[in-house]
Amino acid sequence: MKVFAIGDLHLSGNPPTKPMDIFGPHWDNHWARIKEHWANNVTDDDIVFLVGDMSWALRLDEAACDLQEIASMPGKKYMIRGNHDYWWSSANKMRNLMGDAITFLQGYGTAELIQTEEGPRIIAFGGTRAYLCPGDSHFSPETDQSIYERELMRTESALQEMDRAVETLLEQLTAETNMETTGSETSEPLTIDIHTTPVTKLLLLHYPPFNESNAPSGFTDLMEQYKVDTCIFGHLHDQISFKRIPKEFGTTKLELVSADYLDFTLKQIM
């Protein structure tokens, strides 16, 4: 099993009602290019993280065609909200529309046991939109501070749920191990050592976790506090930003996955 990520698909129906090539020729036919790479590299057993700005639609019913396009692609898909996802609705409404085809995350975290080339591994993941950070040139304390603080709360909620999900998964694996070791002699040999199985924490955000100066923020504090291994985010679309993003912040690896930054391919995270 592999883990991929991409953000900022900016879909608008087929044919698109808002073609992205208005932002430059590099966006020409971008969804077809993404789909080709996706279909050729991702299997149904893989995980795909979608970190916001999926559709230009304003309402959930208008976004349905874009979401169904995404759902038709291979892999188990997890999606967070971006700043342009105005169609985003309640969890129940989105679940009723898409069923199990896409799992929508907002201040939510979970964990899964996956099989990688290096062996079994637990990945804990979750996230939310995040927001502009104090010190950013577009940040206004009067209007943005409360939104920033709300997104910090959602981020911490996701991180706490990730930790609880890991504990629950380990308890389940322990119970299964005990059952197998006390079972019949015909039991299959164990392939998972719960004491040595590594855990990787992946935080999904739409906005980067810092301002234009890459200064520490409440998001980076949470990354340190909860020992996040990798933070995956999008939102950025200019060469200056592409060049300024560091590879790491503290002990957390950073992965920028805006579609145009990735040249309209998916980034393999694991």
Residue ranges and their predicted role:
Residues 19-21, 60, 66-69, 132-142, ...:
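Active-site-proximal segments of metal-dependent phosphoesterases and phosphodiesterases across multiple
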Residues 16-21, 35-36, 92, 110-119, ...:
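Binuclear metal-dependent phosphoesterase catalytic core
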Residues 6, 51, 80, 204, ...:
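Generic enzyme active-site microenvironment
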Residues 10-15, 55-61, 83-91, 111-112, ...:
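Active-site environment of divalent metal-dependent phosphoester hydrolases
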Residues 45, 74-76, 120-122, 196-200, ...:
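A general structural motif
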Residues 24-28, 119-183, 189-194, 269:
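Binuclear metal-dependent hydrolase catalytic cores centered on His/Asp/Glu-rich metal-binding motifs
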